[in-house]
């Protein structure tokens, strides 16, 4: 995390959040979502064994995840995001983010899992959660990209506001 530009503190969204310490301009890199890259099998093992929670991971390819470092885990979700993931794991400002403003991205733009495989292994759907953001356009549930409303999927795809693997999968479907 770019500690010079960001700070972690109590969030109005949920738990801790990441906040801008200076103005971050639209299109500017905020940070890389860093951690250990693991396979889907390792992702499942760590969750089953209670080593990690499913929200500790960022999906970066069909069967690859990053077990994010603690500071990246503090970046909250919003249905009205001011940031997005570009490429593989680069968090970028979607619009100008003012000093003191919390940074949040739409978690649904980073998930496209084989729910049947995950459910079989874990006994539950992976990574479906209630939204706590409270924005006017709140969807109430955070889930897979392909389950987003079609108009929102089209917006994210057209504007390339999702990781490369999501954009590639969307082009095939």
List each model region and its residues.
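Conserved catalytic SET/PR domain of SAM-dependent protein methyltransferases, capturing the structural core
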Residues: 1-173
